[in-house]
Amino acid sequence: MTTPRVPTTFTRKVAGGVKTTTTGSSLPTNNTSTTTTTTTTAAKKLPNGCKISIKNSNLLTSTGLTDLDDIIGGGIPIGSILMIEEDINSSYYMFLLKYFLAEGVLQQQGVFFSSLIGIDPFEILNKLPARITKEEEIEADKNDTTNNINTNINTNNNNKQPTDELKIAWRYQQYVSNELSKQQQQQSASTIMNQTFCHSYDFTRKMNVQSMNPELIHTLSHDAQSQAEGTSPYRNLFLEIQNLVYKYNKEAAMNPDQTRVLRLCIQSFSSPLWSNDEEGVIEFLHALKGLLRSSVATCVISVPTYIYSGAFVKKIAHLCDTVVSINSFSGLGGETPEQFAEYLGLFNIRKIARLNTLSLSFHPDMLTFVFKMKRRKMCIETIHLPPESSRAGDSKPDNNDSNKNKSDQNNIVSKMKSGSGLLCGGGGGGSSNNNPLDF
């Protein structure tokens, strides 16, 4: 007597570690609800103020300034170092540091600030800008733009004929109205996408100190006694950072769903007021870079590169992942050309982060931008130069004035360093003969 054959049983593994069993005699059914529930897995929760880069899948956190996030690839990669080259003629770099710190406070992230140049860290933390909603920002920008339009129209009334006013001012008004509507649409769309990634700030108001969590605020100030004993400030700084990084890594390992990112901010790093030990600077950056690679922390440092040689600046820039610089027009000598009248200086990209890859996953369209300070915020914009010659039918400009304006533009940009060499893998502080507008 022949025994019936037992149907063959197959075991299949699906996502999430759930096993499903099928038999050779089973037939497909139309009930798909049971299969979909077993194959879906819950998405892993990201830390506050973070997102995944669509270019290289790195975990990013915001600098606090949307314009800066856009030009460096979406934000600062976790585990990287962002270096800001300070300007000898201004302190605009402090606005970037305050943006970075304020964003960390609002995102309930750990914030560490250190300045060994005689500045009390709490003095900086008490002057962080207050948060402003997107609606308030749009309304403020609209009012500022309207005031600028009225000022320009009143100025044109003294210099233009009535026919010119109707032809130019009316078209200008229509152009600005269209630009405002586009800007509002873009900002409303970005609000939905990035409502928890980057906030807007108003520098005319101060952040409420009581809103800060004392357990998440960490500082390190200059200790004159340790300096007298001969202890290196870089060693003390690294030990303090190392303890904080280990603390946040341990908390993230114990409770992954409540991971907090640690933001490290160091003002005027490697300044002579810290120490004259250049080897200590290189050793500190080596150790810091290795420490951050396996952590949930990111670091922003500002460096007064104008006091060091080009070779030493290249070493520092090589150990940092992202390098940007601010160069103000003040102190360059001569008058600022009319085309740059509303701007305060140039903002250059020296280096883009390359984490977990050998090549650049983000290629910026430009390396040189311009920045300006509005009443409430800082803006980084693309350079737009007007055409050299006027349109057909208009009065021809004087050749001498045209040549003078062109030479002024060339002179003012020739005094700024180009970052194209470092971006392609070279060192920092490019040759002064390079034109930063040669993209």
UniProtKB/Swiss-Prot annotation:
GO terms for cellular component: cytoplasm; elongator holoenzyme complex; transcription elongation factor complex. GO terms for biological process: regulation of transcription by RNA polymerase II; tRNA wobble uridine modification. Residues 391-407 have a biased composition (Basic and acidic residues). Residues 422-431 have a biased composition (Gly residues). It is found in: Cytoplasm; Nucleus. One of its GO terms (molecular function) is phosphorylase kinase regulator activity. It comes from the Eukaryota. Pathway: tRNA modification; 5-methoxycarbonylmethyl-2-thiouridine-tRNA biosynthesis. Residues 386-439 are annotated as: Disordered. Component of the elongator complex which is required for multiple tRNA modifications, including mcm5U (5-methoxycarbonylmethyl uridine), mcm5s2U (5-methoxycarbonylmethyl-2-thiouridine), and ncm5U (5-carbamoylmethyl uridine). The elongator complex catalyzes the formation of carboxymethyluridine in the wobble base at position 34 in tRNAs. PANTHER family: ELONGATOR COMPLEX PROTEIN 4, PAX6 NEIGHBOR PROTEIN PAXNEB. Belongs to the ELP4 family. Component of the elongator complex. This is Elongator complex protein 4.
